[in-house]
Amino acid sequence: MTDQFHRILMRVQKPARYVGGEYNQIIKDKKDVDVRVAFCFPDTYEIGMSNIGMRILYGVMNEMPGVWCERVFAPWGDMEDEMRAHGIPLWTLESHDAVSDFDMIAFTLGYEMCYSNVLNMLELAQIPLLSKDRDGLENIVFAGGVCAVNPEPLADFIDFFSVGEGEDSTTEIIECYRSAKKQGLTKQEFLHKVAKIEGIYVPSFYTHTYRADGTLAAIAPEPGVPERVKKRIVQDMNTAYFPTKTIVPSTQIVHDRSNLEIFRGCIRGCRFCQAGFCYRPIRAKSADVLCKQAIESLEDSGNSEITLASLSTSDYRELETLADGLLDYCEPRKINLSLPSLRADNFSRELMMRIQKVRKSGLTFAPEAGTQRLRDAINKNVTEEEILSTCATAFSGGWNSVKLYFMLGLPTETDEDVVGIAELVYKILQVWRENGSGKKRGLSINLATAYFVPKPFTPFQWAAQITPEEYLRRVHLLQANLHAKCVDYRYHESDLSRLEAVMARGDRRVGQALLEAHRLGDRKSVV
């Protein structure tokens, strides 16, 4: 395989995606390893290496004695074609061994439209797609991530799911597997043992029955497994594992910077937001711990930017203390500090003025809806006055770029709400004219609308999704009311959002459609 591998690298785009060898990748001696895990991200290297969850769990598993976790990413179409043409199986970046050589194969599920990539990666690894076709204790396939809160569309393919946060459950899973391997247990015996770990769902132990109209009637567990699976959470973020020595990519990735997770959960409760509900309760790290982790990460990686990651960064209670500590380190070294997920109702000009000394970036806000009535309906607790006041403060401080994110198709939305988006944009433009301190540069407003996708375990999980035709009508209605040259409007395509809703809320029968699409050659999630 090695000779073929090197030859095909010269025929594909961005070969650095496939070779590994990055600074801080973890290499172990196979003689010292008794459990090998192939950690698969069902998307490209550039996206997967930007994922903080994957970096955390990669470190968690490799901290365990006798365990070697290696990375696997979905190949781009040109590489997949070469692999199929030459019979080259999917490999890991660290050892370049075939994925089929590994004890356990883990997938992280962060986006429903990557489900087809899970099947494609298993096929490229020359591993049977269906769980029932995989015998023995080798090639155990499990999955976690936010999409695992509804595991049913992938239930026929995945041996078990880890629901909730993975730092603690992952180590328990691997220790359970290590014990089963030493005892020579069968796959079924291992699955019965792992099902006793909190947060673990083994689909084959639950029988689904349906009514005559096709709706779900009941889910019956086998004896000895929980009727309901309780999600796992990390109780103490200050002591939770965080990788300060992370892999430095060999090629440019989507988010090419250090990421500092400041807290999990969200106090806001927006009714459409799955992460806001699934990652409750709020758990924060202290500013002292965060400063220490940030400095260690920056010194090790050499990155020129660090981002404070959370669902709502400006809600962090020690934000100014943390920012002051980080800026004392970052400013003299010309390292940019980025604060995404800011809210218009608690924007601090003084804080932002200091943060922007290294590099002034644009403002980003997500009002989500164009009128106060609809913002109240979705529990987006921000007023038009707060949005305009924040923009006035920022414009007077020298900002001249604003990104605005909205959704179309939210429950109870009317044409008045759609037109309200354009009206809010023009009010922001008027605020710029009255308060902008750098008018020679002009104002740039980047406006984006997404097609509302109802997600499980949110208050809107049962809401209907508008048709693609109605979505496009609302897009065109908004476009017809946007005339300012400074506004760049972009909208999501409707077809993918419709499929996303099906995958997000579907049951096991969706898996049959996934399998059929795979057999017909669907590859749109990557390409």
Model-found features: residue ranges?
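Short secondary-structure boundary/capping segments
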Residues: 54-56, 86, 122, 156-161, ...
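Glycine-rich beta-alpha loop elements in corrinoid/cobalamin-binding modules
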Residues: 74-220, 456-507, 514-521
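Iron-sulfur (Fe-S) cluster-binding segments and ferredoxin-like electron-carrier domains
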Residues: 273-289
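A glycine-rich phosphate-binding loop feature that marks nucleotide/adenosyl-phosphate handling sites
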Residues: 193-204, 311-316, 340-346, 409, ...
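N-terminal pre-triad scaffold of radical SAM enzymes
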Residues: 39-43, 61, 248-274, 298, ...
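Conserved small/polar residues in nucleotide/adenosyl-binding loops
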Residues: 526
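N-terminal [4Fe-4S]-dependent radical SAM core
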Residues: 8-38, 45-46, 203, 209, ...
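Conserved SAM/AdoMet-binding glycine-rich loop
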Residues: 40, 113, 295-403, 408-444
